[in-house]
Amino acid sequence: SGRRFSRMEGDEAGNIITVDMGGTSFDVSIITGNLLPMHREGTIAGHVFGVPSVEIHTIGSGGGSIARVDAGGFLHVGPESASSYPGPACYNRGGDRPTVTDANLLSGYLNENFVSGDGMKLSRPLAEKAGAVHIAEPLSKDIDEAAGLVIFACEQDMVAAIEDLTVRRGVDPREYIMVAGGAAAGAHAVSIAREIGIKRVILPKMAGVLSAFGILAGDASFGFARNVATTTSNLDEASIRKALAELQAESERFLSGLDVAPEHRSLRWSCQARYRAQVWELTLPFDPADLDAEDPGALLAQRFHELHRSLYQAASEDEDVEITEWNVLAIGKLTDIQLPDISAGHVAKGPAGTRKAYFREL
């Protein structure tokens, strides 16, 4: 979704930070040069699974994240969540602990007169009561300051999550645009971007279902792999060519099984490479035609050094490079989803309403 909406807004560089802030979590992923970052393996609840997946960094910061003050007088937001039921205190469903949503309501970012589709109306008095008991009184602050501190703490956690995937890896987030999704993102995306130095934020109309739209609009794809261990100084070209031929045949069978027209098929090649004695490999893109170069091993090694330097700001160009696995991603481009064009309408003169809002920085 992030890549699609950035292109719709005229971005071709494809350097995108996608964020999704829902009720319980804040998810971050970084797209560089229109390429999705992939994990060779991931973890769920501490359990490692060996299935390649998109690299997503998740923290427990969402609209339902509960704010609390510990025994030492320090404010924390999340990872515990009020969930949908009972939900934030302002939902009037029995919840009595303050959340980010309650803080947004108290700060004027949410309209207390708005009635949701199921008839629910937000309760400011309940949000004030929860905020006063659990945050304002323990910190000796008024309710506006307390709500502002909850929002500030939550946003600082989200800034740190983005920096984990950018600054701490030598990537300058100021060179990226942000595509924000999730039901709660609209209240925080601009503040987060301003803190990091991102100059452009895209908040799609369907931000609340951004992830679901991405699945619906994504292309069909499947990855295949062959293990051929070799080094760039002594490349086993015969075994590699045999493996690539098998991978191409598997890919064509997969795409044919989906009835993907030939003109809508594409193959994305890569290999898993590392310096000797390194524990983790890097995914190195390549083209099968690279094997026809005068010295294909040297070509792959040089590209690996460049990739390593771009990710970690260092490379050992005198070291040999090991390649352990050869991969192909078979992609079948599906019919583009055409979003309806909405013609410009007539805006009524004057604001729909006014309300007080609290901003810490003012």
Predicted feature residues:
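Active-site rim segments in enzyme catalytic domains, especially the processed small/beta chain
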Residues: 37-40, 55-68
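Basic, amphipathic juxtamembrane/active-site segments
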Residues: 29-52
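OB-fold/S1-family RNA-binding modules
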Residues: 95
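C-terminal, non-catalytic interaction/recognition modules in large multi-subunit enzymes and RNPs
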Residues: 5, 13, 23, 62, ...
